[in-house]
Amino acid sequence: NLLVLGGGSNMLLTKDVDALVLQINLRGISVISSFENSVHIEVAAGENWHELVCWCLNKDFGGLENLSLIPGNVGTAPIQNIGAYGVELKDVFLDCNTLSIKDQSEKKFTKEECKFAYRNSIFKHQKKGKYIADFFLFSYFCTPFLKINL
């Protein structure tokens, strides 16, 4: 048995866990490509989500400003396609690199393969418990992009 944790911020254990507990603690944020109006950023699954949003804002990269203060780590964000105020993870998601729990092979999932929907993805159902994500590729605007619902 394996229990994979992100940051553990929404876990409440009421009894002993009869499993190997694996907490993803991979760190790293780096710009891997720059274009005229956007940048591609690789982010490790163990990075704190809100800290990633702040890092991007400090560099004037836009796209996920509305998703600040969402608890948890980057690695768990695609499971339910986190979102707030008209913006969702899928709006900046390009792909993620994963490791198969069954045979430890690597597999890259594109945005299309993740089948993002409202608070949903392939990792919440068909691929639940089958892969561990380690790195993500996101595309951000070179200036903040405000989406304000009035």
What is each residue range found by the language model?
Residues 11, 106-150:
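Phosphate/pyrophosphate- and phosphate-bearing ligand-binding catalytic cores of soluble enzymes
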Residues 36, 62, 94, 139-142, ...:
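Compositionally biased, low-structure terminal segments
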Residues 45, 68, 83, 94-100, ...:
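Short, structured patches in soluble enzyme cores that scaffold and shape functional sites
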Residues 1-92, 100-102:
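Anion-binding (especially nucleotide phosphate/pyrophosphate-binding) glycine-rich loop
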